[in-house]
A protein has these predicted regions:
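Glycoside hydrolase catalytic-domain context in secreted enzymes
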Residues: 1-7, 12-28, 43-319
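Extracellular and select intracellular beta-sandwich modules with Ser/Thr-enriched
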Residues: 29-33
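Short beta-strand edge segments in extracellular beta-sheet folds
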Residues: 34-43
Length: 320
């Protein structure tokens, strides 16, 4: 259970008994134990995100009790956001370093501790900073391995002169998509059905080695969105409707790929639960649903496997 105060979001376990079941499926499981919480226990305190609240008023369905004690449906007005997201973002923007012009600092100087990243970045023109944020516009970029899904990093000659390489990214969760033959991997839903993290890690370790041979720096995988609706066109890439299973399987994929010196890229962060017309969608989600369902798998993966890249979703999330 979770509760949100004005500025604190708490994850907590209510007092009581928690039965534990085991089995091959939900129809053939049996109780094997029980966990008892003697009193309410707060497991985590987090800063509440008031800007997750809706901007426009509407009524939501809630359970109520009539005079006879029977449950009936009722409606209540949703609490509205009182926070300016623009002000929050602007308040937390880091201070930009003063532009120095080219000082001859290469990216490898930063890697070898001969210069700081801030000093390297202070050399960059606005067009170079923009290029680093954007990447190349096209799939199958001429700057990368033929058949690539994207290239980013050193897409300008001036960046490459400073030692920033063009990074080749390829689809996807079921194998490398390039203009060459590559291994075909089982889909994410099937992998999650094994419940075998070690097997998944070993599979993607082999995949990482194949990436290195074929010139793929980043595999746009694992797909980690929640199976919210059976009609979602990307469900085959995703693991589960359960964020714990999705998070642990995603972490196994990341560890396997990155054990070979290349990068994984969990996607689509977050709430990409409809593929059709996805760039026009706006997912309206409560803070609790975000924290406990749609972000939880990503949280597990990031904290335990440390992916080098993450791909955002294509939709708007609560108006952004």
């Amino acid at each position: 259970k979770s509760s949100a105060a004005s500025d604190v979001y708490k994850r907590q376990l209510e007092a009581g008994d928690y039965p534990i079941y085991a089995g091959t499926d939900v129809r053939s499981c049996e109780q094997i134990g029980v966990h008892t919480e003697p009193e309410l226990r707060v497991t985590e305190r987090l800063a509440s995100r008031a800007d997750c609240a809706p901007k426009e008023a509407f009524d939501r369905l809630v359970a109520a009790t009539d005079e006879q004690g029977k449950t009936e449906k009722a409606y209540e007005s949703v609490p509205l956001s009182t926070v300016s997201r623009r002000e929050e973002i602007e308040k937390n923007l880091p201070e930009a370093p003063d532009f120095t012009g080219d000082k001859g600092i290469k990216l490898e100087d930063v890697a070898n501790n001969r210069a700081t990243l801030a000093g390297f970045a202070a050399q960059l023109e606005d067009i170079e900073l923009e290029a680093l944020c954007r990447g190349d516009y096209v799939m199958n970029s001429k700057l990368g391995t033929p058949g690539n899904a994207a290239v980013y990093g050193g897409i300008l000659e001036s960046l490459r002169e400073k030692g920033v390489p063009p990074v080749t990214a390829t689809d996807g969760p079921s194998g490398i998509r390039l203009h060459s033959y590559a291994s075909l991997l089982p889909i994410g839903t099937l992998l999650a059905s094994t419940w075998n993290q070690q097997l998944v890690r070993e599979l993607y370790s082999v995949e990482g080695a194949e990436m290195a041979r074929k010139g793929s720096d980043v595999l746009l995988a694992p797909g980690m969105n929640i199976h919210r609706d059976p009609l979602c066109g990307r469900n085959f890439e995703y693991f589960s409707e359960d964020p714990l299973l999705a998070g642990t399987m995603g972490a196994a994929v990341v560890r396997g790929i990155q054990s070979q010196g290349v990068s994984a890229c969990p996607k689509h962060f977050a709430c990409n639960n409809q593929e059709t017309m996805r760039i026009y969608n706006d997912s309206r989600v409560s803070e609790r649903a975000l924290r406990e369902i749609y972000l939880k798998g990503f949280e597990i993966c990031v904290k335990t496997a440390h992916p080098f890249n993450i791909m955002t979703s294509y939709l708007s999330l609560i108006h952004i």
